[in-house]
């Protein structure tokens, strides 16, 4: 992809400061080697997540000043509904404070205890909400998604044979719905093809199964369809999004990604009965159905942002920046998930630290080491994120990854160069790195709040020796 300048001018800046090695060592120890527990003031370049970390436009800020803060019936809600109808094609909208709130509502509405929920790879919070509602998640993604080196252009696709086999095994009436994520975060930001979405729709129609989507990164998915799928080259992303969403009964949306806001989410659907149930629940858990736990200004910012995220020039630059970082790492021999995804570069931590077993938490270890080297914050997406099963045993995912997640409209390629240089330095001394172990394990979504220590420190403590120096010190 040729070099592309940012398709915007920068009107406001926020200073960031590089820290010393000593400061970073103290910070990561205080955080229990968990990058989620680091203070933002201790972070130089923050690639923890793209959720709620985007820079908003002047038009979004302008819309915020016009927000209607009425407790009920605010016109800001009408603006959001109008934008969703125009750009996504769904007539019915129920706002929530963020995507997690929408996941909670739809799980309670659609799942009867004992039912099954197939999907194209798990996502952490989605699966927890499904399980809390009494459902059982089944991964029906294609096998290529579990291979970091596979170059399949649509690694997010549903394996139609796996989906059919589950229907045959449990019966269509025992499937609450199928949840298709676009793109698939845990697979490396991988897209789903339009042909695959249509094929899943045909199966759902045959058996009367609800087809839902986690559409959080729908604009990026549409851009990949434009780039890779026959018949879509040259078509505007906005048009592809409308076609893509026309196949779904409804969507769960975190506005903090492809709506370019710092907070907010919603459910969008066609079925009045689902909307009625959502409104009954939202007043219990979120707020009135016309604000869903959000200020009116946030609804207005989201209404504008979801339009802006469908701009072709913006998306070409956004995905191009992610590729710039990924290609720098590839050129240095750093193992990453291929093809490079839409919102992040995913380092294959199992291959990067191939001398560590999965029980030695290679992805958690690598995220801590990158921070120690440069102050760059990344995120573990491996055994720690996968958690434990109903019997209390560790889940062992096939992918053990570190996610370098690029916030939208925030950093330049100079920042990406700093990140790449840091990862490459760590890669060059990877044999010195020892794993981590839990010292506190949170019982739910453990990757957020668990704490760790180096295995070498644990061994030294058991033997009464001083704690060894950190790698690279």
Curated annotation (Swiss-Prot):
Residues bearing PTM N6-(pyridoxal phosphate)lysine: 257
Family membership noted in the UniProt record: Belongs to the beta-eliminating lyase family.
Keyword Lyase: yes
Cited InterPro entries: ArAA_b-elim_lyase/Thr_aldolase, Beta-eliminating_lyase, PyrdxlP-dep_Trfase, PyrdxlP-dep_Trfase_major, PyrdxlP-dep_Trfase_small, Tyr_phenol_ly
Catalytic activity, as annotated: L-tyrosine + H2O = phenol + pyruvate + NH4(+)
Pfam family name, one: Beta_elim_lyase
Protein's UniProt name: Tyrosine phenol-lyase
Gene Ontology MF, one: tyrosine phenol-lyase activity
Coiled coil region boundaries: none
Domain of life: Bacteria
Keywords for the protein's UniProt record, in alphabetical order: Lyase, Pyridoxal phosphate
């Amino acid at each position: 992809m040729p070099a592309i300048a940012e398709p915007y001018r920068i009107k406001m800046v926020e200073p960031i400061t590089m820290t010393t090695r000593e400061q970073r060592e103290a910070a990561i120890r205080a955080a229990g080697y968990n990058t989620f527990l680091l203070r933002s003031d201790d972070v130089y370049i923050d690639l923890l997540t793209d959720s709620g970390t985007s820079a908003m436009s002047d038009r979004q800020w302008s819309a915020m000043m016009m927000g209607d803060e009425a407790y009920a019936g605010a016109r800001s809600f009408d603006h959001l509904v109008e934008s969703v109808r125009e750009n996504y094609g769904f007539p019915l909208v129920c706002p929530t404070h963020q995507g997690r709130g929408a996941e909670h509502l739809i799980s309670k509405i659609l799942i009867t205890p004992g039912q099954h929920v197939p999907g194209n790879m798990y996502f952490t919070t989605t699966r927890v909400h499904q399980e809390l509602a009494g459902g059982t998640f089944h991964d029906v993604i294609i096998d290529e998604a579990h291979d970091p080196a596979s170059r399949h252009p649509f690694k997010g696709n549903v394996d139609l044979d796996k989906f059919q086999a589950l229907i045959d095994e449990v019966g269509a009436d025992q499937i609450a719905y199928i949840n298709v994520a676009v793109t698939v975060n845990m697979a490396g930001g991988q897209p789903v093809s339009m042909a695959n979405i249509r094929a899943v729709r045909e199966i759902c129609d045959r058996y009367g199964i609800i087809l839902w989507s986690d559409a959080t990164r729908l604009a990026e998915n549409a851009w990949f369809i434009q780039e890779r799928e026959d018949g879509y080259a040259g078509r505007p992303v906005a048009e592809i999004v409308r076609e893509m969403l026309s196949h779904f009964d409804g969507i769960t949306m975190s506005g903090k990604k492809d709506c370019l806001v710092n907070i907010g989410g919603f459910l969008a659907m066609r079925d009045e009965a689902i909307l009625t149930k959502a409104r009954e629940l939202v007043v219990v858990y979120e707020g009135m159905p016309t604000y869903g736990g959000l200020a009116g200004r946030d609804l207005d910012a989201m209404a504008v942002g979801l339009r802006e995220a469908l701009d072709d020039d913006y998306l070409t630059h956004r995905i191009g920046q992610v590729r710039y970082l990924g290609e720098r790492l590839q050129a240095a021999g750093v193992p990453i998930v291929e093809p490079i995804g839409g919102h992040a570069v995913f380092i294959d931590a199992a291959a990067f630290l191939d001398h560590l077993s999965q029980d030695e938490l290679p992805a958690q270890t690598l995220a801590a080491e990158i921070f120690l080297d440069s102050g760059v914050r990344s995120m573990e997406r491996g055994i720690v994120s996968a958690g434990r099963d109903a019997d209390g045993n560790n889940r062992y995912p096939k992918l053990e990854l570190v996610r370098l997640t690029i916030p939208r409209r925030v950093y330049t390629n100079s920042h990406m160069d700093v990140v790449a240089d840091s990862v490459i330095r760590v890669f060059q001394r990877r044999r010195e790195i020892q794993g981590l172990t839990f010292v506190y394990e949170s019982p739910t979504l453990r990757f957020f709040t668990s704490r760790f220590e180096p295995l070498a420190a644990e061994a030294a403590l058991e033997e009464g020796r001083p704690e060894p120096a950190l790698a690279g010190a």
